[in-house]
Amino acid sequence: MDSVNIARRPTRLVRVGHVLVGSDAPVMVQSMTNTDTADAAGTAEQVYQLAQAGSEVVRITVNSPEAAARVAEIRQRLDDLGCDVPLVGDFHFNGDRLLKEFPDCARALAKYRINPGNVGKGAKGDDKFAFMIRTAMEHDKAVRIGVNWGSLDQALLARMMDANNRAANPLPLPKLMQEALIVSALESAEKAVEIGLSPDNIILSCKVSNVQDLISVYRELGGRCDYPLHLGLTEAGMGSKGIVASSAALAVLLQEGIGDTIRISLTPQPGEARTKEVVVAQELLQTMGLRSFTPLVTACPGCGRTTSTFFQELADHIQSYLRERMPVWRLQYPGVEDMKVAVMGCVVNGPGESKLADIGISLPGTGEVPVAPVYVDGQKDVTLKGDNIPAEFTAIVDNYVKTRYGEGGAKRREVASRTIPIRPVKA
């Protein structure tokens, strides 16, 4: 992957289980289950699927005694599967009671998510917040203080509205709401530090559901603290709308060096895999050049020269195959996540894109000779034809991974250079 020089916002370094967040650590991908946590088997299975898809931290709901009682079992089930992904407990309303009554839950989690807006009101709320912070200190756990637009601390908001009404130059209501989110997060972090929690165990988030509001809030929050920030557009929505909205907001902030963990909060389509939010988060980071997770396939959009759907089917097959193989490949073949593959539909851009990729195939368009040249490291390697092109090209990709990224392939990677012949344009 081409290097991208984006100056990251300086932050503290926080450890969440074995995962480092903030400072010079890579931007981390997070996800969340939608299972009933009281169903230990079902929750562990979904956590495992999310981790296999590439989620580096997984959040689970801890909302009842039944759920809290199964957290340790979920952790054990994952350990038995060889899955060490850190678990984050998502607490609302009754987190103090659940952590007190189920100490195994407190120990099994790597991080506690606390929402200042619903931990409790007044002195009672302060006591509940303090108990959760002290529990995190006792077990050396990280804490994310996560403020949400939809559950903002109403007492804080009322206090700020009163002060704003008395101000000589009052803020417009939308700006006041943004400021209330930021103040809630910063004041809660200050309270946690006063109680005794190390600043190096704190992550902040201020989530809203509007793209421009999210950008404004995080720009301001990022300039007023050195805590790592978790990015996410809450209630982003379903399908393409959710993907576009999340990407539009997060890409702007990431380009400015703001953000240390991200989650794409998609509403799944009926029957859709929960892992899609992980794939979208990875692809966002990878297309921005911030990280590499899996080889990505370059494919043309199609036009009148590509009336067949064959190249689309092959591109989809190859992308799916690469994702399926990555849990094994990332362990066996370091560097394979940077591999570039091209599946092109006709002679116009097909050969050129295929030469620019590590490995590429240029399929015949409408009216072209029914052959498909394959290019490896910029050079034409073989020409495929017939009904077995998908299987043959898949085998070529598989062999390329083994020879280039396997044992003995490191030297080849170091010395490999790509020469792309440029033909002069005829007058």
Curated annotation (Swiss-Prot):
Q: State the InterPro entries in the record.
A: Dihydropteroate_synth-like_sf (IPR011005), IspG_bac (IPR016425), IspG_bac-typ (IPR004588), NO2/SO3_Rdtase_4Fe4S_sf (IPR045854)
* Function field: Converts 2C-methyl-D-erythritol 2,4-cyclodiphosphate (ME-2,4cPP) into 1-hydroxy-2-methyl-2-(E)-butenyl 4-diphosphate.
- Report if keyword Iron is assigned: yes
Q: Where does [4Fe-4S] cluster bind?
A: C300, C303, C346, E353
Q: What is this protein called?
A: 4-hydroxy-3-methylbut-2-en-1-yl diphosphate synthase (flavodoxin)
**What HAMAP family has UniProt attached to this entry?**
IspG
SUPFAM superfamilies xref list? Nitrite and sulphite reductase 4Fe-4S domain-like
How does the cofactor bind to this protein, according to its record?
Binds 1 [4Fe-4S] cluster.
Q: Does the keyword Oxidoreductase apply?
A: yes
Q: Which GO molecular-function terms appear in the entry?
A: 4 iron, 4 sulfur cluster binding; 4-hydroxy-3-methylbut-2-en-1-yl diphosphate synthase activity (ferredoxin); 4-hydroxy-3-methylbut-2-enyl-diphosphate synthase activity (flavodoxin); iron ion binding
Give the Enzyme Commission number: 1.17.7.3
Q: Which reaction does it catalyse?
A: (2E)-4-hydroxy-3-methylbut-2-enyl diphosphate + oxidized [flavodoxin] + H2O + 2 H(+) = 2-C-methyl-D-erythritol 2,4-cyclic diphosphate + reduced [flavodoxin]
